[in-house]
């Protein structure tokens, strides 16, 4: 009985140490590639009413964000842009999952995929998200965004702030075509 309690206390203490670990303050300059693609509404029964628009773009960083993410054992990476009192741009940022390493361009920038929706703040249901290109006309054209890394039960860290995004281009977004996997020869 005592042995079980001591194991529980040791594991709880270890979790608390991980949760209290100091996360360095980063300010990584990130630029967004000015091209967006539209992903058609998903086939989810609850969203059959109208679906929602899911956009993707590309972010470039001189520092390897994926290494910061792994080194400090973050659980999530958010891409957020407060918009107005009604909506916010919210999504995720990740390295290209089809590659072993992120793509490095000749100017030595790491390339990351950014997926995002435009929804009411903190709306996980996606039921009231922007679903029609006409709705974009009522939104501000330029946003200031940030990338946040965080842990489920711990601190989060803002990795980059004041990333400029021009959403006026979303009206001209192309339909997303998933990349074709190459067959091994």
Q: What are these model-predicted stretches?
A:
Residues 11-14:
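Hydrophobic helical h-region of N-terminal Sec-dependent signal peptides
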Residues 24-36:
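Short, low-complexity, disordered segments immediately C-terminal to signal peptides
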Residues 27-29, 126-185:
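Surface-exposed edge beta-strand/loop patches
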Residues 33-39, 43-46, 141, 152, ...:
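An extracellular/secretory-lumen and virion-surface interaction module
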């Amino acid at each position: 009985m005592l042995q079980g309690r001591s194991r529980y206390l040791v594991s709880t203490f270890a979790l608390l140490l991980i949760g209290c670990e100091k996360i360095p303050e980063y300010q990584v300059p990130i630029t967004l590639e000015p091209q967006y693609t539209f992903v058609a509404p998903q086939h989810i029964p609850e969203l059959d009413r109208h679906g929602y628009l899911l956009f993707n773009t590309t972010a470039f960083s001189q520092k390897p964000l994926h290494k910061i993410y792994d080194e400090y054992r973050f659980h999530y990476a958010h891409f957020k842009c407060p918009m107005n009192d009604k909506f916010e741009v919210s999504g995720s940022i990740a390295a290209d999952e089809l590659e072993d390493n992120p793509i490095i361009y000749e100017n030595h920038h790491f390339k990351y995929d950014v997926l995002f929706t435009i929804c009411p703040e903190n709306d996980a249901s996606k039921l009231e998200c922007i679903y029609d290109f006409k709705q974009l006309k009522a939104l501000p054209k330029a946003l200031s965004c940030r990338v946040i890394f965080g842990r489920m039960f711990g601190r989060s860290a803002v990795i980059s702030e004041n990333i400029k995004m021009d959403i006026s281009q979303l009206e001209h977004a192309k339909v997303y075509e998933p990349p074709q996997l190459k067959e091994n020869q």
